[in-house]
Each structure stands twice: as C-alpha cells, then as structure tokens.
C-alpha cells in the first residue's frame, strides 16, 4: 500500500499515522454505512482506523478491513487500528477479556493501539450506560493505575502493540506517569481538540512527556442530540476559518485538519461522504504559514462539543480541571 500519510514515532518505538479515519456511528442505520465508508477510506489511502467497543460497530469495521486485505488493497501490517476499553471494564480482571472480545468481533489477532476510553468507571455488565431506577448512571470505583497495569499486560501478551489513554486530564496523566513500577508510559492521549478547543496547555504537557496528542472532533461535530448542546456554533462555518480556506483555495475542513498536523497533533477525520473522505487526504498537499497558525490559535474559546455531562458526579470526571 502506497499511502502518503506521514507518521509520528510513539514513545514505545511504534509509529502512528498522523491522519486517522474516525468510525463513530450513533444510529443503527449508520453501522452499515460505517463499513462502506471504512472501505472507501482504505481505498483512498487512509491506513489509521479509529474505533471502540462503545461504538458497537467493530464487527462491521473488521469486515471492512478484512475485505480490503482479501482484495489485495492492503496487508494487515499496513493498517493501524485503534480500539478502546469502555468504562464498564475498568476492573483489572475485565481488561484483557474486553480486548479479546473486540479482537473476536474484528477478526484480528492484535490491535495497534488500545486506549482507556474515559477515566470514569461504570458498573460492569453488558449495558454500556448502566442506570438505576431513577435514570442515574451506576458508577464503579476502580484505581486507574490498576487498570493501567492490566493494559500493560495486554501489550506484553501481544494483543495490543501500543497502549494509551483518552479524555484524561493532566492530573490523571501524572497519576499514571508517577505510578510505582510503571512499565510502559501511555503513548498518546486522545481528546476532543479543534479550533474552538485547541488544548494548548494539555498539548504542551503531553509533548514534555513524549505523549502524542490525538484529536477527535477535529472538524467540530455532527449534531448528536444526546451529547451536545445544539446551540453551539458550527466550527466549519467560522468566518475566520472560511476566509483562511479561501486564501489557501481549500475547504474549511482541510484548514482545520492541517492546523492540527502543523502542531504535531494526530487528527481524526470522520465522514460517511465519499467525496469528503477523498478530500481529507489533500491535507498533505499544503502547509499553513506561521502567521496564519497564530490567527487560528486565536479562535480558541474553550468550547466542548462533547462535555460528557452525564459523568459529572464521578470523582474521576476529567473536565473540571483547567486541562
């Protein structure tokens, strides 16, 4: 496979492609769509596929990858596949079985990257969001350092090439980094990051500790009713961004993605639209001038499209801290 996607070296010696394809599909009818769009993404040169147990479409994504291996488009080693440990499996004894369950669904022998999806622990079981009779989430109390040790064992067993975290704040990263007997540092922290939430302080902390920041929601967001405030401004309609797009003769989405790559961030782009999937690959055809990067830095307004409010009552809720 001849992909023009550049890679960044991780702190464990493996490398991650700087542009990834996001596969989150909220509704049932989008599951099949996520399979088709993943095939298209691989066809046009995406080799980094980001998924999760939470998305409930790993079977479809696995089929897409397998079909592209079988038709000779790619080899397994060309693909960088990320999965994530959901909050109902934080207890150490549940970590490996959860990863093995994902691998079975995917029909893969290993994942390239396995992340703790969210630092808030939920009651174990088959329900993704277990609730009591009043509709409140049923939380669990787990020491994330114990969860991390179980993640390290998954790496040692060859089930995951690299391990990292997602949605962790600085304090939570510090807790892992300062853990007595730490065997492997997290290779990355995948967080919401875009022009309206540029995460500059968290990025600086991650760089200082040789942790790659991976951006989800890099293009703002589709409007998922259950998790975002519908009054939030549409990122890709931002006048400064649109003017910049005109200047570079690119789309606002390409400018938003290039902004992240120029900061040393790995960006995830999600689309079910073939034309846009193809277009996102053009991000490697240009660079932004440093003055324009400064202008884009100025768009930050600390705006979260995914505030995850339903987890606020848990002591590990990550977004109360400044970063």
From Swiss-Prot:
Residues holding substrate: 117
Annotated function: Catalyzes the conversion of progesterone into 20-alpha-dihydroprogesterone (20 alpha-OHP).
Keyword Oxidoreductase assigned: yes
Recorded catalytic activity of this chain's protein: (17R,20S)-17,20-dihydroxypregn-4-en-3-one + NADP(+) = 17alpha-hydroxyprogesterone + NADPH + H(+); (17R,20S)-17,20-dihydroxypregn-4-en-3-one + NAD(+) = 17alpha-hydroxyprogesterone + NADH + H(+)
Keyword line: Cytoplasm, NADP, Oxidoreductase
Top-level taxon of the source organism: Eukaryota
EC top class named in words: oxidoreductase
Name of the gene: Akr1c18
Binding site for NADP(+): 20-24, 50, 166-167, 190, 216-221, 270-280
Protein's UniProt name: Aldo-keto reductase family 1 member C18
Site (Lowers pKa of active site Tyr): 84
Single biological process term from Gene Ontology: cellular response to prolactin
Molecular function per GO: 17-alpha,20-alpha-dihydroxypregn-4-en-3-one dehydrogenase [NAD(P)+] activity; aldose reductase (NADPH) activity
UniProt record similarity statement: Belongs to the aldo/keto reductase family.
């Amino acid at each position: 496979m001849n992909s023009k996607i550049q890679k960044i070296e991780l702190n464990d010696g493996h490398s991650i492609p700087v542009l990834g394809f996001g596969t989150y599909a909220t509704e049932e009818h989008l599951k099949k769509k996520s399979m088709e769009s993943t095939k298209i993404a691989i066809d046009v040169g995406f080799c980094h596929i980001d998924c999760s147990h939470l998305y409930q479409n790993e079977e479809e994504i696995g089929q897409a990858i397998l079909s592209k291996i079988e038709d000779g488009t790619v080899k397994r080693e060309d693909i960088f596949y990320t999965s994530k440990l959901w909050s109902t499996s934080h207890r150490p004894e549940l970590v490996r079985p959860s990863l093995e369950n994902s691998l079975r669904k995917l029909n893969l022998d290993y994942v390239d990257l396995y992340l703790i999806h969210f630092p808030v622990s939920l009651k174990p079981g088959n329900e993704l969001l277990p609730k009591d009779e009043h509709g409140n989430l049923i939380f669990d109390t787990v020491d994330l350092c114990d969860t991390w040790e179980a993640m390290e064992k998954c790496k040692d067993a060859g089930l995951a090439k690299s391990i990292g975290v997602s949605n962790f704040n600085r304090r939570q990263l510090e807790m892992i980094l300062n853990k007595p007997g730490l065997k492997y540092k997290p290779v990355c922290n995948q967080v919401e990051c875009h022009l309206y939430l540029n995460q500059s302080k968290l990025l600086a902390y991650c760089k200082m500790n040789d942790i790659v920041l991976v951006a989800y929601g890099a293009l703002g967001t589709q409007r998922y009713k259950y998790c975002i405030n519908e009054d939030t401004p549409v990122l890709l309609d931002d006048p400064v961004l649109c003017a910049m797009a005109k200047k570079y003769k690119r789309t606002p989405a390409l400018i938003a993605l290039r902004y992240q790559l120029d900061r040393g961030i790995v960006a995830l782009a999600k689309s079910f639209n073939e034309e846009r999937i193809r277009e996102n690959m053009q991000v490697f055809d240009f660079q932004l001038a440093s003055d324009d990067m400064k202008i884009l830095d100025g768009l930050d307004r600390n705006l979260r499209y995914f505030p995850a409010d339903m987890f606020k009552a848990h002591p590990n809720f990550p977004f109360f801290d400044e970063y």
